[in-house]
Amino acid sequence: MENTGSRELVIKEIKLFNKWSYDFIEVRDPSLKKYICLKPVYLPHTGGRHEHRRFGKTHVPIVERLINKVMRPGRNMGKKHLAYHIVKKAFDIIHIKTGENPIQVLVRAIENAAPREETTRIMYGGITYHVSVDVAPLRRIDLALRHLTEGARMKAFHSPIPIEEALAEEIVLAASNDPKSYAIQKKEEIERIALSSR
């Protein structure tokens, strides 16, 4: 017996949290393009498989890296499920506030909050000097994510504002390059110190 009905293989589009599409997300900063992973995933959880490879972090989805930064030592340490829900709710709030894809808003916030220059300590003849150096792209992303989550944590700590709202607000402010954002303030402070120690 022959089956005359043709079967079509329907591949659903992979969306983050089953809501946000990875299509048309652009990274404007050419130095960060290679290091911001926008590989489509349903659930941003790689289980630390990148850990033992050099530059393994470049293959971890950027949203998972944000989730991992939310999971800081102290109250939220090791609670990835809690951090996952914080970021998920924050993305919903970002979409309500801006009307844009939250992944694109996050990428824009990282580009704006990533410092280009910082200082390092060099010992020369028994005296320590602070010398201005360029920041590696991977470190730029790490610093931007750290400052975004630090700002949200500081805003929500001892405050009636939930962490989800604080994180969403911090990301939106950083995406619009607003000086009220903690991440933008830290970036400008780091670059100002680096400029003075050239």
From Swiss-Prot:
**Signal peptide residues on this chain, from the entry's feature table:** none
Q: GO molecular function, one example?
A: structural constituent of ribosome
* Cysteines paired by S-S bonds: none
SUPFAM superfamilies per the UniProt record, alphabetical:
Ribosomal protein S7
Keywords of the record, alphabetical order, are: Ribonucleoprotein, Ribosomal protein, RNA-binding, rRNA-binding
Give any single GO term for biological process. translation
Tell me the Pfam families matching this sequence.
Ribosomal_S7
The protein's matches in CDD domains, at most eight in alphabetical order, are given as: uS7_Eukaryote
GO CC aspect terms: small ribosomal subunit
Per UniProt, subunit arrangement is: Part of the 30S ribosomal subunit.
- Give the family from UniProt: Belongs to the universal ribosomal protein uS7 family.
NCBIfam families per record:
PRK04027.1, uS7_euk_arch
Spell out the protein name for this chain.
Small ribosomal subunit protein uS7
